[in-house]
Amino acid sequence: GLESLTTGQIDLAGFDITRMHEDMLAALRRDHVGIVFQAFRLIPSMTAIQNVAVPLELAGRADANAGAADALESVGLGHRMTHLPDQLSGGEQQRVAIARAIAPRPQILLADEPTGNLDSGTSEKVIATLLGATEAAGAALVLVTHDLALAERCGRVLTIEDGMITDDRTTGLKGDAA
């Protein structure tokens, strides 16, 4: 739903999204999908709680601030709610991004190289937060990574080379992640 397909179709929540116009796609993403980007994509002039509240406000939730506070607590940042992004470390910024993605309680969480620009110690904490938050929310996680050890922590691993699936296997671990 973020990029146009050249062939095939994508079914999500019972809908063929390749046939939807942009307004319908935006509503589907808002209601069913959370996204964590490699580059945190936080709004610099907004505090952590304001950044996390954005998708809740867009969904018309009256409890946007309470939901944002709960999500920040769940990723261990309850004490940093009023801080601006430039007052947070890289790992903290990524945890704010995770909180923003899980706050609306999506069915699917997409994470594109969520630790790509973090050091190894911070990466482990962010991944533990991401996996724990996904499980707690009962969401499926679709994780894009070049880190094979991280991929092995997921329940299902798809290997894609030159745009084609070259391997599809389960790891025996609990979860829907790929």
What are these regions (language model features)?
Residues 1-153, 157-160:
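ABC family nucleotide-binding domain
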Residues 157-169:
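H-loop (His-switch) and adjacent beta-strand-loop-beta switch element
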Residues 166-178:
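ABC-family P-loop ATPase nucleotide-binding domain
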